[in-house]
From Swiss-Prot:
UniProt enzyme class: transferase
One GO-annotated biological process of the protein: aromatic amino acid family biosynthetic process
Chief location category: cytoplasm
Taxonomic lineage of the native organism: Bacteria, Bacillati, Bacillota, Bacilli, Bacillales
Catalysed transformations (reactions): shikimate + ATP = 3-phosphoshikimate + ADP + H(+)
Subunit structure: Monomer.
UniProt function note: Catalyzes the specific phosphorylation of the 3-hydroxyl group of shikimic acid using ATP as a cosubstrate.
Name of the molecule in the record: Shikimate kinase
Length: 174
């Protein structure tokens, strides 16, 4: 992809497949891929739970936005953290980007994927109702900035891959 073009930015709740699908598409197409959470952990030498524990969620959201800005012109595909839309700065920044893809998923499937995952501080030890409340609080924001939405529990990785491939090809024509 030409870096004068906008990257594909994957948004959505935790456990919807942003990192898995982003990496898959990047590997298949020989594109650059950045997972913002992994980027933060490598850059700051702390895990996401450690950052939450030592500095709090707001501090993490500021790091997340800073790292998104750093990566926006260097990656072809970016997987954001599920809560990136919680930051007003990041949300407003994303509103001005193209190719925002919302990966959505059924909350029961999300819960089964992330239940008690120690690497997800906003999900750890939460009931399905608590997780659903958090999910519902974010839906409108995901919807507001998404160019396209895929239900990752209804489509296979390869089906999403081919849909994204069509977007990449269309993007390269402009």
């Amino acid at each position: 992809m030409n870096h004068d073009k906008s990257p594909i930015i994957l948004i959505g709740f935790m456990g919807t497949g942003k990192s898995t699908i982003g990496k898959y598409v990047a590997d298949e197409q020989n594109l650059s891929f950045i997972d913002i959470d992994s980027y933060i952990e490598e850059k700051y030498k702390l895990t996401i739970p450690e950052i939450f524990s030592k500095h709090g969620e707001q501090y993490f959201r500021n790091l997340e936005f800073t790292c998104l800005q750093e990566c926006i012109n260097t990656a072809d595909i970016i997987a954001t953290g599920g809560g990136i839309i919680e930051s007003e700065e990041a949300f407003n920044f994303l509103k001005n980007q193209k190719n925002i893809i919302w990966l959505d998923c059924n909350i029961d499937i999300i819960y089964s994927r992330i239940n008690d995952d120690p690497h997800r501080p906003n999900a750890n030890n939460k009931t399905i109702k608590q997780l659903n409340d958090l999910y519902c609080s974010r839906i409108l924001r995901y919807n507001e900035i998404a160019f396209k939405k895929f239900d990752s529990h209804l489509l296979s990785i390869s089906e999403i891959y081919y849909e994204l491939l069509n977007l990449i090809k269309a993007s390269d024509q402009y």
